[in-house]
Amino acid sequence: MPAANPKLPSKASLRSTGRPVSKVWMFSHECAGLAQAGGLGEAVAGLSKTLALDSKLDVSVFLPSHGRHLDPSIRESYGLQGLATFIAQGHRTGVNGLWYNYLAGMEKGSRDGVNYFLAKGLDSATSKWLDDPVIYDHEATFEKMSLLARTVGSYADYLISMGRARELPDLIHAHDWHMVPAGVLVKQRLAERGMAVPLVLTVHLLSGVILPWHYASEEWCGIRDIPYSLRTNVKRVSTLKFSQIWQDVCRNSLEKFGCYIADYVTSVSNTYLRNDVSTYVGNTIRGKSGHIYNGCDWNPAIIESSIVAVEFEKIRPGLIDGAPKRWDLREYLLTKAISKIEKESEIKGPARLRDGSRKKEDGSIETFRSDGPLVLMTGRLSPQKGVDLLLDAIPLVRSAIPETKFLLFLLPSNDSDLTKTTLERARKYPDNARVILGRHPSIYLLSHLAADVYAMPSRSEPFGISALEAMITGNPVVGTSVGGITETVVDLSAKGESGTGILVPPENVAKLAQSLVSLLTIMQLDELGQRGKRDDAGISRKILVQSMARMVAKNRNLGSKIRENCRNRVAEKFRWTNAGQMALNRYSVARSLALKTLQK
């Protein structure tokens, strides 16, 4: 039974405390291992894990179940159990004046030191939304956002009523626009009780969502229309109601509202924060914003040993010294391994789409007839990622290096027309291109160990974890000069032999193709050297970027140096432990700002 008079910390004690953050509630629409559609899920899982294991914080991740609590394998691996004494119930009032009842609960589990709370439906009307397995669907997404906000708000009230206020967070970290209602709601509920719990909002990707105040209000998501001390610029603080902030200040922008209410705003790269987020939101985040990089903890040695054991054992006896080289892995991947993708049932991806390109009658992906330099691309199938630009570049690259292969692992979206168009375009190059929808885990990793160059032709890229996955496995990146790519990839044209790839202007297919040809040739020359062969065919003449042509003239093994640069850059700067330390610094500032706000 709830405690009659729950004992809460006094305002005075909360204002004066200087203790560091120790308990964090993460709010996210997705999380790797449970329900993931893209880099957001990877970021939330990686940051939560390092904060829990390396920084020893008590971290809890809250997200809609998306029906994952019904999966026996997930229940077992996360130890999920229903919270028997917690129920979130009530009604939401629609713009039509009708009541919509909801009845929600939560499943709790843990993994790698992190607690996970999955909001689920306890009746058919609520389960229809919270347990919908499609992570992103227009109507369902907004329903999940609202119901999750209601559920976590009720959970905070539940802990207080049960005399368990010590389980409440020291800090709330909301990830992306989907979690603005939940983050603001819990912050508001705790502030009403004198608890200065800071809200950190990370903008992973701007969406420009515009909604009426009714959506966020107490009628629907649950945010009360009470006065709030809002800092509208660096020096000025105004007291406005939440509806005024939403409508008059933020012009019904969900993301602007979140940034205004948050005590601290972060994004995943400094470039994206300053050039995109700040431009969109305005000066209000000056003095309360900073970036937190994403990370990658892949261990190439472990990956290689496990992949070789699983995928490569059959041809090991044919190797001279028993140890496969990169070109051995590549030949095996292109001429044998990719045929396994449809035969085996490991493919994973949204909606389990498996309509890969060049399929054989038995449903498997058709292998290439020969080996060749390999360009790899991975990521979501969306206009943002520029898959169409890479497909445009194929004939240009092929004219210079006819044997080049392009392998694209793409996570499909709900845009069936885009999927169909992409597959049709790839089929025009049967000797050069394969598109694989979803991920076959072992083949996906093998492709990183086997590739020569990684392509990242994004039109916009807040960070781009895939660039880290490429570089840690020794793949130089040809990427567009946008967002986080400019901070992860060191341009060979500008930094010489210390570079990790080439940056090209966005939407410039000619430059993209030219850079791919130049970097592929550098890697081919290095491979010839490792094999003890000479450049009798004069392929070095294909290097079209003159600064790199001069570097290769001095060092024919430049490719090996670039691969080493790639691995070192990720290992030294972009591990999740690095991201965790950045987050702790941002949390400290957010806590100080929240305490100052409460004192006003």
Residue ranges and their predicted role:
Residues 2-600:
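Catalytic cores of nucleotide-sugar-dependent glycosyltransferases that transfer UDP/GDP/TDP-activated
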